[in-house]
Every structure is written in structure tokens, then in C-alpha cells.
């Protein structure tokens, strides 16, 4: 998962290198990249449909629409006929969820914007809310490993703890556990090329 809104920046360079390395080292495994720069994911609007959909098995709720107006009138389906963690907003988040559900491991590469995630990345993370409601009954499931690679300039005196917190929280409800944090400060040259390895940091 690449959290930068720039399609060809340093995060993309790092993600592409890791993608190629994964293919070379584990050719039998499937590897996919989800970049916020190339997906259409709207922010959560707090409509509460995902919570209401899971309140009772017999309650009807809006069917997932095709891409388009998220507020458009939808048909109703029953809870028992649909996935447990769907959102009524019709955009690319449905495809993102398919990748998350199929993943055995997750790697996140993100820049730091004012100590936190870019708006596009934050919007995607906020859309994990349906997982929260569906997982209220499934807390015992084993979580899959997640690694966060932080690409930053280092000029913010407040660090990047807010980024770590939101990634850990949002992906936690999606079934992942943040196990490794890698800081790439000073590891890129002026042209955006990788010149050094990232440094693994301790997680609180």
C-alpha cells in the first residue's frame, strides 16, 4: 500500500523496489500494489450504514452501488446476503478491500504530512470503519503482519507518531498487526534515488 498522492515520487520508488524484490525472492507468491495515487477512494461520510447493516441479520440496508454518486438511491439487500464489511459508497474501496482480505502480509509505504498521513491515505484508512463493526464479534482471529516504511524529510519537530498511530489503528481493525517500523530519513538523494537502507525503529 503506497500512501503518497504522487505517482512517481520517492514512496513509489521504494515500493517498486520492494515489489520487484518480493517477486524475485518469492516467485510463487502473489504480490499486488495499491497506491492512493491511482485509486478513487472517497472519505468516510459518517453515514453509519456499516454499523446499522450489522445490527441485526434481518435488517435490510443499501446495496453496494457501482462507482458514481455515493448518495444515489440504492436497492436494499439483507445482511445475510452480503459480505460482513462492505461500505455503501460506490468507489474503488471495494477492490482495495479484496486485496486486504486476500493478503497474508501487508507493507505500507507512506510520506509524512505534518506528522501524519496525506489526506488521500487518511481517507483510505478511515474507510476501514466497516471492518471495525464486523470485527466486534471476531476479536480472537490471528492478525497478519504489517510493516510501515516512513519516507520523510525530517524537518517536522513533532516527528511522525500520528502517522504510526493511525496506520496501526485503522489496519488493526482490518486484521493486521503493525510489527515493524522502518525510517527512511536521509536515504534518498536529491534525484529521489535510494542511496542507503532504511533503519528499523522500535515500536511502543
Positions of the model-derived regions?
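Short, glycine-/small-residue-rich phosphate/pyrophosphate-handling segment
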Residues: 119-120, 137-181
